[in-house]
Structures are given as C-alpha cells and as structure tokens.
Amino acid sequence: MVASGQAGRDLGRWNAAYPHVYPLDFSSLHTPGRYSIDVSGPVTAQSPTFDVADPSALFSGLAANSVRYLTTQRDGPNVAISVLRRQPSHVQDQRALVYATPSYRRGRLVGRLQRVGGPVNVAGGWMDAGDTLKYAETASFADVALLYSLRADPALPGAQDEAKFGLEWLLSLWRAHPRRLIYQVGLGNGNGRSILGAHDTTWALPERDSTLRAAPGTPSHFVKYRPAFRDGPPRAGTSPNLAGRLAAAYALGAQVFAHRDPALAARALKAARMIFASARTRHVGTLVTATPHAFYPEGEWRDDMELGAAELALTEHGATRARYLRQAARWATAYANSRLNGTDTFNLYDVAALAHTELWRAMHDFHVQELGGVSRATLAEDLKGQIGLAQRAASRDPFSLGTHYRDDDTVSHALGLSVEGPLLDGILKTSRYAPFAQTQRDFVLGDNAWGTSFVVGAGSRFPQCLHDPVANLDGSLNGSPPIMVGAVVPGPVNASDLRGLSLSRGYRPCPVKGGNDLRAFDGFGARYEDNVVASPTNEPSLDTAALGLLAFEQAAGK
C-alpha cells in the first residue's frame, strides 16, 4: 500500500440500484508506476490496474492512435493495407459524375438524380463513419484538427502524411471554374427499390462496392458509381459553413506545408481565398452539410466564417492580413449576436472555441488590442459563457458530465469541453478551467457509470463491438488485436434511441454471446450498449476522433 484515504461526499443518485455515488480522490499520488485501488468497508471493490506517469507518456500514444484511426478511414486507391487489412475501395470515384442536391421525404429519396456535370476525380479522402460516405462537412473538421495539431507538434507520428492526404482530397472538392464545391461523395439513402444507397445494402467491406455488377438503371448502380453532389447552381455562392471551414482547412494547410511542400501550400492558399470569397452570407437558409440534411443538421455558420478568416489572417501578410483580421472580427461579433450563441459548446456544429482562440492569437501576434468592437477580453467572455453552460450541467450530474446524455453525441461534447477549457486558459493565462477539462476527459476514458472507456485501445475496457464493417469483419470481437485503435464512439444516448435497431445481413454478431452486461449501470434516462447493432452508441466517426486528437494532444502538453 502506498496511500490511503476516505471516499468523498455523496454526489447523488444515479439509478435505483445505485442511489449513491462517492468519488475517490487519489490525485496526490505522483510516483510513476502501475497501481490499483482497493475499497474496503460496507462496500468492497478493486479497480483495474492503471498507470501513473508523465502526461506526455500517458497521452501521446492516444494522440498517435487518433491519427491511425484516420488512416484506417482512408478511401480510394491509396489505403493503408497494413491497417486492418484495408484494400483499395471506391476507385470509381476517380471518374465520378456530378449531381444536383436530390430531394428527400421522410429520409427517402424522391425522384431521380439530376446530373449537372462531371466526370471529376474525387477519389481518396476519409470515409465519414461506418457507411463509407465522404463529406466535406466532417472531413474538413477532421483535417482542421489534424493540421492544427501538426502545427503545434510537428513530431506527431503519422500526422504529416495523413494531413496531406486529407488536404489533397479537400482541394479536389473545390472546382475553381466555375466556383462550385462538391460537398458529398456517395448516396446514403436511396428509395429502397430502384435506387439503392449505402444504407440500403448488405453489411460489407468498402472494397466490395467496386466489384458490384451495377449497370446503369440497376438498383446498385449508385453504390458502385457513386454520385458527387454539388452545392447549388453556378453563381449561387457556397454555403457559409462549408466556405468558412474549408477556408480554414486550406489556410492551415498553407501554414503547415509552407516549407515542407511549397507547391501544395500555394494551391491551398489560393483555394482558401477563393472559397472564402464565395461564401453565401445573405439569405442563407438551410445550411448544406449532407444529403439528406438530417444526417448532419448544423444550424450555425458564423463561427465557421470567423475560423476561416482567422486562419487566413494568420497565413497572409500586410494589407491582406489586416483585411482578413477585420473579417474575422466581424464574424466573431455576428456569432456573439446569433440566436444560437450560448446553446452549444465545441463540437462539429460549433467551432467558436477554436475560432475565438485563433482570432485571439492573430490579434496577439499582430499587436491588435481591439478591432470592430472585438477585443481579446470579449472573446474570452464569450467562451466563459459556453463553459459556464457546461459547468451548470456538470453540477447536476453525479459524474460531473458537462453535457446532457439525451442530446446524443455525449462523448463528442465531453471531448470538446476538455479541449475548450485549456483554450480558454490559454487566452486568460490561467489554469482555472483545467480541472473541469480533466473531468470531461476522464469521463470519456472510463470515469463514468458504465466503467468503460469510449476510445478503442484506451484503458482495460473499451468498445469491442463497433458499428463499422471494417472493424466488425476484419478486426477482433474481443478487444485483442487487430482492433480499430483510436476510434471514438458516441457513447450513452437516450435509452429510446436503442429500441428496434437491426442490421442487414452480413455482419458478425457482437457480443458473440449476446446480451448487454452494462445495462445495470444505465441511469438518468441514458443507456450505453457495446453492440454492433447499436449505431447510436457505437458507430465511430471522423469528427469525434478529431476531437479526441485535440484533447489528447493538449493533455500530453503539446
């Protein structure tokens, strides 16, 4: 025994079986080594073994695994065969035809697809999740996170090649003449009869799609010959969320590759200027994210424009830099006055935390105290409001989670908060928000009611039954290698979201013996299930892994 102590105060009721939650604080233990905790008294328990070590030693491997997950998600001819036996997939994307945004009713395709151009080469990129589709919305978010991390930590294993791979694909989506953006590759939902999409077919590895017999007019034609969907007609402008976020990714690419690959950096900067200028910021309407929109129902865009302008300001020089700095301040003000401000925290749908931080950095670097009513202090105050929202939620939860289980995307919001706290501390030059950020990260890594990490490969228990064909068909089903390391699952959701779920034929049942050994720990209306069928809790995705990368890089001190 190296230390002893008493359980903390009762934090409240979790469910009928567990009416009391008591914290165990061993933060005074600093000596590196492997430990376990023994609980004695009226209740006895023993924890799994865990490491106490330098933060870099604990978290650098998790950050590298986040990059490895992106490598696993590669699509096209240049996949990593050494990762879960991946094989080239969707090679027909090299000559994809371009289509207008189709119509949907209740999640089903209405009418036929209308061709408006092509062929275009949109092969490559990252598959968004388990369904093999590719979106500018999520791929740009992931590459922003990767490039941001690489800028701070050039030694991050595998990051340079992966960031370049993602950037090249994002550049392939922007058609300079005319100024149009491809925002999605692949059809998710067809009509279930004459036109099938990725969600209408059997469970299979991505490479299967390229081998289908799928002549024009056959139901599977668009599964093999995947459509590339264009954002609006010519001269309509680009949806501002995508214009801002892709401008940010391109500009970050220009920063990161300025010396490593000057030609790529020049292409990226040119594209960043053009797509930012193309943003449709009047009469915006429904944002373009995915088809159908319900897949990714983003509602806010001013934060994306702020982020794009801030990254351009950090990339440019002289009068051009000043112009983008004014643009960033303009959109920071617009975001602060938006009806959605104060309703969300850092995640795929709200990047204000990163945008404010990068604008603050630009103002600091260029010795600007105030611009258009925006100061470093006002940026910090806006982020304090977001963190305050989360802290109020955490005060009502026995496990101090700063988001609501019933909002879905529980893990992505927790990871976002674990990133946002240190970003705000960086602006304020304090460590005030570090403990709260650590609590959110700890929740993701196992300090939760279910006692499981939600990151594959992290901890003694983590998800084994991913809702992902690559993991399910080419990986193990018991947590031993090969596994999809670095994948992050959505985590607990509203219990009603797990009713009536099923899968098409072809999957390997997991858990092998069935059942749900974690059900006794469901509470607060939330449920977590480690089951291949349970897509709401167990389908990993790009955006959640990207947040994991940012969180683990910060925790490692990078």
What is each of the regions a protein language model found here?
Residues 333-342:
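Solenoid-like repeat scaffolds
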Residues 1-43, 68-140, 148-149, 184-245, ...:
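Aromatic (Trp/Tyr) and acidic
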Residues 44-52:
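Edge beta-strands of extracellular beta-sandwich domains
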Residues 288-298, 341-347, 397-407, 457:
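Acidic, Ser/Thr-rich low-complexity linear motifs
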Residues 153-161, 223-278, 282:
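A conserved hydrophobic secondary-structure block that centers on an alpha-helix together
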Residues 159-187:
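Carboxylate/His-rich catalytic cores and anion/metal-binding grooves
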Residues 53-59:
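Extracellular interdomain linker/stem segments of modular secreted and single-pass surface proteins
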